[in-house]
C-alpha cells in the first residue's frame, strides 16, 4: 500500500471534438422535420430564447444543438447569408 502513494497517477480529459455549425443545423433540421415541426420557426424560437425545449430530443437533436453556442450559430448564418 505505501508504494501506491509514491506513483503519480495520470488523469486525461478527452477533448470534445469541435462540431461544425452547419452539420449541427443540418441534423437538427432533419430531426425537427421528421417530427413534423417547422425547423425555421423552432430554430428561431431557440435562438431568441435560448430555451432548448424548442428543439426536439428526437435523434439527440437537443443535445447536439447545445454543443454549439447560440452566437456561433448566428455568426455562421450571417456569414452564409452575406457571402
Curated annotation (Swiss-Prot):
It comes from the Bacteria. It holds the Pfam family IreB. NCBIfam families: PRK05473.1. Belongs to the UPF0297 family. This is UPF0297 protein Moth_1643. It comes from Moorella thermoacetica (strain ATCC 39073 / JCM 9320).
Amino acid at each position: 500500500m505505501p508504494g501506491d502513494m509514491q506513483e503519480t497517477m495520470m488523469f486525461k480529459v478527452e477533448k470534445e471534438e469541435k462540431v461544425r455549425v452547419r452539420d449541427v443545423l443540418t441534423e437538427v433540421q432533419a430531426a425537427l422535420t421528421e417530427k413534423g415541426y417547422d425547423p425555421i420557426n423552432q430554430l428561431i424560437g431557440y435562438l431568441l430564447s435560448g430555451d432548448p425545449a424548442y428543439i426536439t430530443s428526437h435523434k439527440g437533436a437537443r443535445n447536439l444543438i447545445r454543443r454549439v453556442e447560440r452566437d456561433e450559430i448566428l455568426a455562421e448564418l450571417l456569414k452564409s447569408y452575406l457571402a
